[in-house]
């Protein structure tokens, strides 16, 4: 198998320095070579264990080190998670993502996690989890249970990383991604814009992701959501064009990956989001809440989809059954139905 070309920091920096419209044109051309530009992947995200995380990530309201007013919750029961997954599927979601605020899962938690994955998979949904660091055995057990994707973000460049997190190393994050890949699970990994990093740091983050032995299949690009009580609560706002530029560079560097417009969409107007889609973003989380931070209300997403002529990505299911796709299309048109899914209500 031919190895994908490796990027250099100077090459990535040159992309960031291109005139914005020229950069967007290049990104859109590359995007159209690999994806239908009118199709957007729609996923649902559920926090299955909230708060009391021992890590010191300065952006995160779930850290036990910061007083953010977030109440910690224990790991949800298996049937609770499966009930949420059923509602997500009824609303038309094709991927169900589950997050737990852990440094790493304990061995006692693994049987529950395996049952959750098996149960969600049995519904015909793609599965994704983010649970912190994994060892080889844990990664393999999740793979054997049927986990499709594992999310573990690099957050920022190796050089800036120590300013944001001290309780786990950058190499530990890379090691987890390697274990996930070796277990046969697809990788979801990205970062955050607005931590106080420089453009060179943004280039460094994308360089790390694109130069992995196999680039992530899914690349979430988050805009910092500033939460009172966290050390980054008073950070400067991110310029919209700088964020759009980051999306475009990610698309150019990782042409076959899904680039997810992730946290921070609540802070973006429709024009900014539209330019992100033009820059190559082709995946979003659908629902009012992303773990513990706000996400645009569903009706706003539906209105924006209509204005831009975007559609939920077509679902590949067995025997030509397109019921799941039809459900999502109906939901996008009729947000007042019983199946209309509100992630924040779970």
From Swiss-Prot:
Q: Which Gene3D superfamilies match?
A: Aldolase class I
Q: Which GO terms describe its biological process?
A: biotin biosynthetic process
Q: Which residues bind [4Fe-4S] cluster?
A: 53, 57, 60
**InterPro entries (UniProt xref):** Aldolase_TIM, BATS_dom, Biotin_synth/BioAB, Biotin_synthase, Elp3/MiaA/NifB-like_rSAM, rSAM
- What EC class does the entry list? transferase
Q: Which GO terms describe its molecular function?
A: 2 iron, 2 sulfur cluster binding; 4 iron, 4 sulfur cluster binding; biotin synthase activity; iron ion binding
Residue numbers binding [2Fe-2S] cluster: 97, 128, 188, 260
> Which EC number(s) does UniProt give?
2.8.1.6
Pathway given for this chain reads: Cofactor biosynthesis; biotin biosynthesis; biotin from 7,8-diaminononanoate: step 2/2
Pfam entry (one): Radical_SAM
Q: Provide the function of this protein.
A: Catalyzes the conversion of dethiobiotin (DTB) to biotin by the insertion of a sulfur atom into dethiobiotin via a radical-based mechanism.
Q: Which PANTHER family match?
A: BIOTIN SYNTHASE, BIOTIN SYNTHASE, MITOCHONDRIAL
Which family does this protein fall into? Answer: Belongs to the radical SAM superfamily. Biotin synthase family.
Assembly notes: Homodimer.
- What's the protein called, per UniProt? Biotin synthase
Q: Which organism is it from?
A: Salmonella typhimurium (strain LT2 / SGSC1412 / ATCC 700720)
């Amino acid at each position: 198998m031919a190895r994908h070309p490796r990027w250099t920091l100077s090459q990535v920096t040159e992309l960031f320095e291109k005139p914005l419209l020229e950069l967007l044109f290049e990104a859109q051309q590359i995007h159209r070579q690999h994806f239908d530009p009118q199709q957007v992947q729609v996923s649902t995200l559920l926090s299955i264990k909230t708060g009391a995380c021992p890590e010191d990530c300065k952006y995160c309201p779930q850290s036990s080190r910061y007083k953010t007013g977030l109440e910690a919750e224990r790991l949800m029961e298996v049937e609770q998670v499966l009930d949420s997954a059923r509602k997500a599927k009824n609303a038309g979601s094709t991927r169900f993502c589950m997050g737990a605020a852990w440094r790493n899962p304990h061995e006692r938690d693994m049987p529950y996690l395996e049952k959750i994955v098996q149960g969600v998979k049995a519904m015909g949904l793609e599965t994704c989890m983010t649970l912190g660091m994994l060892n080889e055995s844990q990664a393999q057990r999740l793979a054997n249970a049927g986990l499709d994707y594992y999310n573990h973000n690099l957050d920022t460049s190796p050089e800036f990383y120590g300013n944001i997190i001290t309780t786990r190393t950058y190499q530990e994050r890379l090691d987890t991604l390697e274990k996930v890949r070796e277990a046969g699970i697809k990788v979801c990994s990205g970062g955050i814009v607005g931590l106080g990093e420089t453009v060179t740091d943004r280039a460094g983050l994308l360089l790390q992701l694109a130069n992995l032995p196999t680039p992530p299949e899914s690349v979430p690009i988050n805009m910092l959501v500033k939460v009172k009580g966290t050390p980054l609560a008073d950070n400067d706002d991110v310029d919209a064009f700088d964020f759009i530029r980051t999306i475009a560079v990610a698309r150019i560097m990782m042409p076959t990956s899904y680039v997810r417009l992730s946290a921070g969409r609540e802070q973006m107007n429709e024009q900014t989001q539209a330019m992100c889609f033009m820059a190559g973003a082709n995946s979003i989380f659908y629902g009012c809440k992303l773990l513990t931070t706000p996400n645009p209300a569903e009706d706003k997403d539906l209105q924006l989809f209509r204005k831009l002529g975007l559609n939920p990505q077509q679902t590949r299911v067995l025997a030509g059954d397109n019921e799941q796709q039809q459900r999502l299309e109906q939901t996008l048109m009729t947000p007042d139905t019983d199946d209309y899914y509100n992630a924040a209500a779970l």
